[in-house]
Amino acid sequence: MTIKRGVSLYSYQDEYVRGILDLEGCIAAAAAQGAFGIETLAEQMMPGYPFPGAPDLPDSFYDKWHDLMSQYGTTPTVHDMFLDTKRYTSRPLNHDEMVESLQRDIRHTAKLGAQGIRVIVNTPPEVVEAAAPY
């Protein structure tokens, strides 16, 4: 088995936020460093994700994503989900909203073509259990 390099797009957060790199630029930079695998963070680099009550990202986004993966010889490996429990200033997310958010991340991960999802530490186990059959 050959070990291959993977890079989290989180590594490029500074360049992305300051406008030095866009999503494609981050992927290109990772590929230039010899990365094959790409870990994604939708909230950070995928515009419109995840606005409450908004539909999933459009198919055109995923078409462009797969074109970029092909162009740079990379592959999505894992999606790093972030459960924004403080999305609303007046209250925390309730259980059903957290499950819905995780289900959206599961759909997103599948559409990206990633094989896994990394659930962050603040995601309650009962939310993961409720979303797992999805």
What does each of the following model-derived ranges do?
Residues 16-21, 50-54, 89-94, 128-130:
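Short, solvent-exposed loop/turn segments at secondary-structure boundaries
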Residues 3-10, 38-40, 76-81, 117-119:
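Hydrophobic faces of well-ordered beta-strands that scaffold small-molecule active sites
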